[in-house]
Amino acid sequence: MARSSTTSRIIGWAIRLLIGAMIFSVVGVLLWRILSSGDPASMTVLQPNEQIFAAYQEEGEQLQILHQQHDIIIRDGPSKGYFSVTQSEFIPAADQLQITFRYNNSTLKYVAEDYGKAAPLERGKDWFDVTVTIAYDLTPDNADDNDINHPDSVRFERYQPTACVKDTKNLYNYERLTFDGIDICAGFDEQGVPIMRPEILAVYVDIYFNEDLDYEQEPLGTLLIYLYGDERSVLVDTPDKKDVAALEEFGQK
């Protein structure tokens, strides 16, 4: 009887240890996924150029930055999950937009399959063309004609990046892109709330495959990063310590 009781206790402890190990493994994997999916440091800091540095000289550390409070990812269509924008920051005083564009290594595999290639696209090469398209309202007094079916009232203008910094982290590939000449904010009210320009209806990020680049065709993916009238997702902020350090370093060059 004693031997049977001892055996039962051993089996019970073994089962508990096995269950504990399984729980620990699952939690470990989840934590790794959370930590590994965060943007690398190079992708979370403002990338200085002459335009933003001039604005910083005028405004100092009170330089206003408008950024999204959430990631933006393609959630439907043939390129579902291929691309995302993890940060989009408008700097009104510099007429500038900076975004952090991200895609998974699996995107290289799926895009290769979409284009009939035998092997996944090689990591580290310049496969994708990333631009910004802005929809301008040519008749801001009439809100009933603000769609693509009214080309006489809505104009689309494409902006090319003026700078690009690349990085990788685990399974992800990143690009920090700067776009100059983009002015979506007319100023700020007494409470510091941005006054958005009513003639700018929306701001999109378009992704094309460089081997099949044709702006007259549909892009591989499109991400909406700003929509007039939906300013709830836009947060007003100022440069953090890393941004200030980067701007100060740029000014010393």
Annotated model-derived regions:
Residues 3-24:
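N-terminal Sec-pathway targeting helices
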Residues 16-19, 29-253:
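Alpha-helical, hydrophobic structural elements that either
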